[in-house]
């Protein structure tokens, strides 16, 4: 199962429904894998990070960012805020995390890699 959001709480509820439905169909929950696709921007200025996501969403999809955010998981802000955001989905059941990085990919990859042990605990 590979959804794109919208938030960790809803993802967790849907994850539980996914597992329950699979078990009722005779599937072993240990055989199920769940991923999540999230859009993040890491910047010290949270407002600037969120604005960069909005700009990206508008240019990529040609739709209002508020509409896209209503069903896509997005977070802009400090590395601590972004890690907490990602951890919410992991805690709710995501086995794999796919990140769309908005901004300087190399810098964000280094920041996330330096703290990777915190992401998937």
Predicted regions and their residues:
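Active-site-adjacent structural elements that line small-molecule/cofactor binding pockets in enzymes
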Residues: 1-121
């Amino acid at each position: 199962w590979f959804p794109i959001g919208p938030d960790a709480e809803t993802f967790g509820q849907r994850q539980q429904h996914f597992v329950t439905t699979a078990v009722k169909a005779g599937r072993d929950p240990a055989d199920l894998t769940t991923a999540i696709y999230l859009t993040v921007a890491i910047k010290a200025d949270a407002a600037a990070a969120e604005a960069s996501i909005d700009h990206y969403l508008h240019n990529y999809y040609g739709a209002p960012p508020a509409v896209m955010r209503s069903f896509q998981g997005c977070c802009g802000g400090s590395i601590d805020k972004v890690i907490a955001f990602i951890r919410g989905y992991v805690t709710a059941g995501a086995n794999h995390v796919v990140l769309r990085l908005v901004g300087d990919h190399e810098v964000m990859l280094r920041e996330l890699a330096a703290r990777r042990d915190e992401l998937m605990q």
